[in-house]
């Protein structure tokens, strides 16, 4: 089992520009790599609130961070960040929010969670085990057109239709219940394998995103972040594939541009009302980090700041 390593750790902490007495949110606690580093930069007056969908992560936080009075964990999605900030009484006063998107190494490496096409396990893929719909429900019950749409939209899978049909044909014989069963069906249906990429990679990503509503949650969270942050509060987001990064990039660009009037209205750029700016360029891992942790290779960090 791979040791969990926080990706772009130092770069994201630097991007948050942490104030010793500040208030921070780690929207994706995982195994606390980023949270631990944030706490290392805080004084006794500082506060850190963390969120995670995964009850294993929440329990880990309570076991290893529970005695730290500066720290509090919430069970749920980062799409509930405004609700949690309200409960904590810190809306409009938060100095920084960190989001480290996607599946964590402990989830990926545990066969019982069903995220990996390399490990035999139940076809589950739920980040939050308290939710009712899992990957097996979707794979065995969705219509062929819905399967194809999800594979295309969330996996950018070229052969979405062919793979969807193969799944429907296979489940007529018996339900698809394990990860390796599904991976084999996809492998057989995929006529052109990408170099250095397992043929089931895109389909598994698509199902995981769909089951966990990852992109919907991300969009909802980003919209709430500006309400949660205080003036000069920072937002740091680490994404791992183009679909996530596109949403983050577009959000930050739109917020920086502000409320643009119609093109025919004569108004100077500096007169546009905006309360957000992007900070620096997108940051990618250095070759040394990729060598040490191959899962970091596709990571992109984007940072923004609320102005007022």
UniProtKB/Swiss-Prot annotation:
Catalysed transformations (reactions): cytidine(1402) in 16S rRNA + S-adenosyl-L-methionine = N(4)-methylcytidine(1402) in 16S rRNA + S-adenosyl-L-homocysteine + H(+)
Localization per Swiss-Prot or TrEMBL: Cytoplasm
UniProt KW Transferase keyword: yes
EC annotation from Swiss-Prot or TrEMBL: 2.1.1.199
Keywords recorded for this protein, A-Z: Cytoplasm, Methyltransferase, rRNA processing, S-adenosyl-L-methionine, Transferase
MF GO annotations: rRNA (cytosine-N4-)-methyltransferase activity
Any coiled-coil regions, as ranges: none
Pfam families xrefs: Methyltransf_5
GO cellular component, as recorded: cytoplasm
Superkingdom of the source species: Bacteria
GO biological process, one term: rRNA base methylation
InterPro entries: RsmH, SAM-dep_MeTrfase_MraW_recog, SAM-dependent_MTases_sf
Binding positions (S-adenosyl-L-methionine): 32-34, 52, 78, 100, 107
Keyword Transferase: yes
NCBIfam families (alphabetical): 16S rRNA (cytosine(1402)-N(4))-methyltransferase RsmH
Stated role: Specifically methylates the N4 position of cytidine in position 1402 (C1402) of 16S rRNA.
PANTHER family, sorted: 12S RRNA N4-METHYLCYTIDINE METHYLTRANSFERASE, S-ADENOSYL-METHYLTRANSFERASE MRAW
Family of this protein: Belongs to the methyltransferase superfamily. RsmH family.
The protein, known as: Ribosomal RNA small subunit methyltransferase H
Species: Legionella pneumophila (strain Corby)
């Amino acid at each position: 089992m791979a040791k969990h390593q926080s990706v772009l750790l130092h770069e994201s902490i630097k991007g948050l520009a942490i104030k010793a007495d500040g208030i921070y949110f780690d929207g994706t606690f995982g195994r606390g790599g980023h949270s631990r580093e944030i706490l290392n930069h805080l004084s006794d007056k500082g506060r850190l609130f963390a969120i995670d969908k995964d009850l294993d992560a929440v329990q880990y936080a309570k076991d290893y961070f529970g005695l730290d009075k500066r720290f509090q964990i919430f069970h749920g999605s980062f799409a509930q960040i405004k609700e949690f900030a309200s409960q904590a009484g810190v809306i409009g006063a938060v100095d920084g929010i960190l989001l480290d998107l996607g599946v964590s190494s402990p989830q990926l490496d545990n066969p019982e969670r069903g995220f990996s096409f390399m490990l035999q396990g139940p076809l589950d893929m739920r980040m939050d085990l308290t939710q009712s719909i899992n990957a097996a429900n979707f794979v065995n019950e969705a219509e062929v057109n819905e399967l194809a749409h999800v594979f295309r939209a969330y996996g950018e899978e070229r052969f979405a239709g062919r793979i969807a049909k193969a799944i429907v044909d296979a489940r007529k014989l018996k339900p698809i219940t394990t990860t390796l069963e599904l991976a084999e069906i996809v492998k057989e249906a995929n006529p052109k394998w990408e170099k250095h990429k397992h043929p089931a990679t895109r389909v598994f990503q698509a199902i995981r995103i769909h089951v966990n509503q990852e992109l919907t949650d991300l969009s909802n969270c980003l919209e709430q972040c500006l309400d949660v942050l205080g003036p000069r509060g920072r937002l740091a987001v680490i994404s791992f594939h183009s679909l996530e990064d596109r949403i983050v990039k577009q959000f930050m660009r739109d917020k920086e541009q502000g409320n643009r009037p119609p093109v025919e209205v004569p108004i100077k750029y500096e007169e546009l009302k905006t309360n957000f700016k992007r900070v620096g360029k997108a940051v990618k891992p250095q070759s040394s980090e990729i060598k040490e942790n191959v899962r970091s290779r596709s990571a992109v960090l984007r940072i923004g700041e609320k102005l007022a």
